[in-house]
Amino acid sequence: MLTKGDDYPIHQLPEPVASAGGERNFYDRYFFNGYAREGQAFFALALGVYPHRNVMDASFCVIHEGVQHNLRASRHLGVERMDTRVGPISVQVLEPLKSLRILVHENDYGIRADLTFLARAPALEEPRFQHSLGPRSLMDSTRLTQNGSYEGYFSVRGGRRVEVASEKWLGTRDRSWGIRPLGSMQESPSEPGSIPQFYWLWAPVNFDDCVTLYDINADAAGTAWHTHGVVAHLPDGQPETMQSVSSRVTYRPGTRHAQSAQILFVRPGGDELRLHIEPRYTFYMSGLGYLHPEWGHGMDRGEMALAYDTIDLATVDPAIPMYLHIQAVSRVRMGDRVGIGVLEQLVLGPHEPSGFSGLFDMAP
């Protein structure tokens, strides 16, 4: 069956683009976040395509005046993957790898947005994510990450329109595709007799003259099965991949969230760079479907579904499992540089270096 994508020279197999293949957990996904240099204003968008599940879903979230607003949409995919609209939420590629547009059209919940991402740095391909559990391949995906600025506006019900100017708003986007666990947690059981485990930190940071990227996935003993660090100098500097990277987290009591964190970069010549991360406020990734019991990624909500809820950031209980996965908007120091970025955190199950031995035990 032919679709619009077949008119582009992008084929990798002797099949039409719409062919869903046989992997139920294949996905293709956009992610964006944006944050003001000053204050506590934030937005995020995710849009995912799940061909074998016949689902496309999207979420747009805003933090405004201490409340996180979450707008979610889901529809049946059909065959046309290049129609990246889900209800009122859509993504447009204006210039590949340089500029993309987020739109949230009028809806019953009062959230609107028209935001354009403008690249500050080149899109960086991260090392391939590959992870197995026994004989099963849990993750096999490619991801690009790109830091940038934004211009446009967003608004929420009962709130004023917030103007977004590129000199005042920064953020990060990523694109990833491949295989990873989808749907509810019940669809991704752990090995018999074992406790589910996942340790993940991701820290894309914007400085005035450079950007940095860091991630780590580690097992229960703390051994990394994926980790990576890059510094890219602006505007046109060649990205420098670190020789080695490591991190250390101090947790807030009663949570699995960072009170502070340090990242160590060792450059190819042996010089060291240290990033000191000071979280300022928290975005809960459940707004984008992560760990959400009803709006998990790729879950079939029918022909078309739309939902909205809010999180009061002053009263939310971070020990509730749905709120484990976060992005902490943070002040970051690297030598004399001071920047801003996020520290994404998902610490599920045992992690010996952190002192966690159970599924949901918290820091003392």
Role assignments for model-derived ranges:
Residues M1-P364:
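Structured soluble/peripheral alpha/beta segments that form catalytic or ligand/cofactor-binding pockets
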